[in-house]
From Swiss-Prot:
EC number: 5.6.1.7
Binding locations of ATP: 30-33, 51, 87-91, 415, 479-481, 495
One GO CC term, this protein: cytoplasm
NCBIfam families according to UniProt: GroEL (TIGR02348), PRK00013.1 (NF000592), PRK12849.1 (NF009487), PRK12850.1 (NF009488), PRK12851.1 (NF009489)
Segments crossing the lipid bilayer: none
Protein name, UniProt field: Chaperonin GroEL
Role: Together with its co-chaperonin GroES, plays an essential role in assisting protein folding. The GroEL-GroES system forms a nano-cage that allows encapsulation of the non-native substrate proteins and provides a physical environment optimized to promote and accelerate protein folding.
SUPFAM superfamilies (alphabetical): GroEL apical domain-like (SSF52029), GroEL equatorial domain-like (SSF48592), GroEL-intermediate domain like (SSF54849)
GO MF annotation terms: ATP binding; ATP-dependent protein folding chaperone; isomerase activity; unfolded protein binding
PROSITE patterns assigned to the protein according to its UniProt record, in alphabetical order: CHAPERONINS_CPN60
UniProt entry keywords in alphabetical sequence: ATP-binding, Chaperone, Cytoplasm, Isomerase, Nucleotide-binding
Source organism (scientific name): Pseudomonas fluorescens (strain Pf0-1)
Family: Belongs to the chaperonin (HSP60) family.
Record Pfam families: Cpn60_TCP1
Length: 548
């Protein structure tokens, strides 16, 4: 086992503090509408330029192991805020830096670190409760656009396109972000249920100009097995032909004579039909077939529940207003499923999302949710260069997380104002002893830090701005973009309550842990002499040629 180096008490905390400050100083430069860029070197390719706090934090590793511990702990603050609310990473870092710096001064002055932490925790609970009181619901498109704009570093086009996407697919709908091919951001919306399986034969195509098969008022047969024998399908095909409606077959696979017969029937116009493989694999395929069944009001024909193809009737078939099949995708629009059944299915999938611990499973479940709840919106990010594309895409993703958080828990006035107003909750708060009171004072100072940093990044005097905002009431705050004071909500400067809350909770949690650290253990640096022990002998090997 490698030798370890151990530092205790003040010397351990001082080293960690250096790391905390190095990382926080790099990250906090990006805060606010006039935040600066940070340039990140890459081991290959062009450097990346970003104003995204968590991207900066992730890149930082320090040479000194003890300093690096402090930096990594603050990086964890940014990651926690990002995981919980998807944004607020820079605010969380600024709060953590203030808590650690002010707290360590108190520890050096002889305060009990455990009581300091208790005071900080007590004050955090009070501030979070006050933030919830200040929170206003975020339901209208304008407010959603404003939240997106602020999170995307005051880029109106991003806020507007996210609000438009939410309007089209609903608050629960899935919105994905992709790299576009143009200079402008684009929004495309796929209505209905889309899955990534195309027609099994090009002979099903009935729109040769666009190479798609379109079925109007289609009946839908869902089968949880391979179909290779046409005989077992004859009863249902005859019933569909009598009904005079087109048929979509979704099965594990359709092959051999079954596929050939379907193609011939389609080309002769006996039955207008198209076949497609069921999406997904294994258990996920069964679940997605069931989703389609609920959406279209049909039943999955499966031997597991005692249904066979031979006994299938029109009652077992689902239906939809329109089905469009291309080479790669199938879209089912306006399924005839019962609304109550669809909502029950959505609730069931939501419960599974809450229970799963796998990110992959969660993503797949959310995709299924979107398909059931009415569509998928794709934001294609436009940019002039690859470097700009990466930076812009990260901002769009941040803004999307922020708007989701706003819809979930509401909004508070932005620009650090909500935390200043929440100070009211801890002005007269008392701890159980004098040291806890100091912990409360540490947090009182920390909640001013985001506003101070926004003002500093804008080239203004932080103390003047903080005093001016403190003297105001309600939504009164400082618009750093224009240098004006006024009502933050009216000026469209909003922060999601969840983002502000998560930032504060993550910062006070990690800040408290650093303050109560009494020993730090790291790998001891390797001595240079140890690695070079065998080198002198190598010189002797060069003479071997002369010996021969």
């Amino acid at each position: 086992m490698a030798a370890k180096e151990v530092k205790f008490g003040d010397s351990a905390r001082k080293k960690m503090l250096v790391g905390v400050n190095v990382l926080a100083d790099a990250v906090k430069a990006t805060l606010g509408p006039k935040g600066r860029n940070v340039i990140l070197e890459k081991s290959f390719g062009a450097p990346t330029i970003t104003k995204d706090g968590v991207s900066v934090a992730k890149e930082i590793e320090l040479e000194d192991r003890f300093e690096n511990m402090g930096a990594q702990l603050v990086k964890d603050v940014a990651s926690r805020a990002n995981d919980d609310a998807g944004d607020g990473t820079t605010t969380a870092t600024v709060l953590a830096q203030s808590i650690v710096n002010e707290g360590l001064k108190a520890v050096a002055a002889g305060m009990n670190p455990m009581d300091l932490k208790r005071g900080i925790d007590k004050a955090t609970i009070a501030v979070v409760a006050e933030l919830k009181k200040l929170s206003a619901p975020c339901t209208d498109t304008k407010a959603i656009a404003q939240v997106g704009t602020i999170s995307a570093n005051s880029d109106n086009s991003i806020g507007d396109i996210i609000a438009e996407a939410m309007e089209k697919v609903g608050k629960e709908g899935v919105i994905t972000v992709e790299e576009g091919s143009g200079l402008e951001n684009e929004l495309s919306v796929v209505e209905g249920m889309q899955f990534d399986r195309g027609y099994l034969s090009p002979y099903f195509v009935n729109k040769p100009d666009t190479m798609v098969a379109e079925l109007e008022g289609a009946l839908i047969l869902l089968v949880d097995k391979k179909i290779s024998n046409i005989r077992e399908m004859l009863p249902v095909l005859e019933a569909v032909a009598k009904a005079g409606r087109p048929l979509l077959i979704v099965a594990e696979d359709v092959e051999g004579e079954a596929l050939a017969t379907l193609v011939v029937n389609n080309m002769r116009g006996i039955v207008k039909v198209a076949a497609v493989k069921a999406p997904g694999f294994g258990d996920r395929r069964k679940a997605m077939l069931q989703d389609i069944a609920v959406l279209t009001g049909g039943t999955v024909i499966s031997e597991e529940i005692g249904l066979s193809l031979e006994s299938t009737t029109l009652e077992h078939l689902g239906s939809a207003k329109r089905v469009t099949l291309s080479k790669e995708n199938t879209i089912i629009v306006d399924g005839a499923g019962n609304d109550g059944d669809i909502q029950a299915r959505i609730a069931q999938i939501r419960a599974q999302v809450a229970e799963t611990s796998s990110d992959y499973d969660r993503e797949k479940l959310q995709e299924r949710l979107a398909k059931l709840s009415g569509g998928v919106a794709v934001i294609k990010v436009g940019a002039g260069s690859e470097v700009e594309m990466k930076e812009k895409k990260a901002r769009v993703e941040d803004a999307l997380h922020a708007t989701r958080a706003a819809v979930e828990e509401g909004v508070v006035p932005g620009g650090g104002v909500a935390l200043i107003r929440a100070l009211n909750a801890i002005i007269n708060l008392k701890g159980d002893n004098a040291d806890q009171d100091v912990g409360i004072a540490v947090l009182r100072r920390a909640v001013e830090a985001p506003l101070r940093q926004i003002a500093a990044n804008s080239g203004d005097e932080p103390s003047v701005v903080v005093n001016e905002v403190k003297n105001g009431k309600g939504n009164f705050g400082y618009n750093a973009a224009t240098g004006e004071y006024g009502d933050m909500i009216e000026m469209g400067i909003l922060d999601p309550t969840k983002v502000t809350r998560s930032a504060l909770q993550a910062a006070s949690s990690i800040g408290g842990l650093i303050l109560t650290t009494e020993a730090a253990v790291a790998d001891a640096p390797k001595k240079d002499g140890a690695a070079g022990g065998g080198m002198p002998d190598m010189g002797g090997m060069g003479g071997m040629g002369g010996m021969m």
